[in-house]
């Protein structure tokens, strides 16, 4: 099937140019040949227009396609063949009651229920351990349901949604330029990712051309943010298996990364760096040289601790 691709991200597309497929034709698309970026519904009267954004990693191109279904209707679940649709289909069903028939795990994504149907393991030697939603200090509240056999964890199911803020609706009201800070606040450790997506949206719609240097600096901030998240996850894994020295080491290395971000724009999480049409800070040469030294040390330290951790 020929899917019209756009040349790159941050490229405006008129709604009337987005192809609309009949649902049977839509479900026949070989989605396993692409990476699923987005799958969401937009109400149109008593129907919902479902947009799907796909990326082709071999060509670095994006496409956007759509289909239209009535609210409270049904279609054959895409998750059965393409697991990447798993959460997207659950959210679509939760919001619009469009049922993906055959979905293997059709549970609410955000709705909190006293009788939530957690996965269970039956057996005389199994037991459940419930953790949260109030736990662990600074991270988002979540309920973790462990099924265990002795000290062995058989399964873990996580339920979030306790602090759903309705961010999408907040974006619909007020001055669009004031939403930059809101975009930074969608996810605390991904501030640069959120604001880069939002500013990229405004810049592409406004046909604003961003200087090459500014683009490179944004990419650098995104990579620092990504590295900090990955290193933090490695530290969390080490802590979960009681490898305390590893957890401490990863935490110390992560601090070097976020302190480098702070040297660029005054905030360890990159808040305030990305502006609309340009960046709000400029990275001076002497700061860049220090950053290079920091990142070389980070690489050496991560290689050393990971060699021990995964041996």
Please name every model-derived segment.
Residues 1-26, 30, 39-46, 50-71, ...:
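Active-site bordering "gate/hinge" segments
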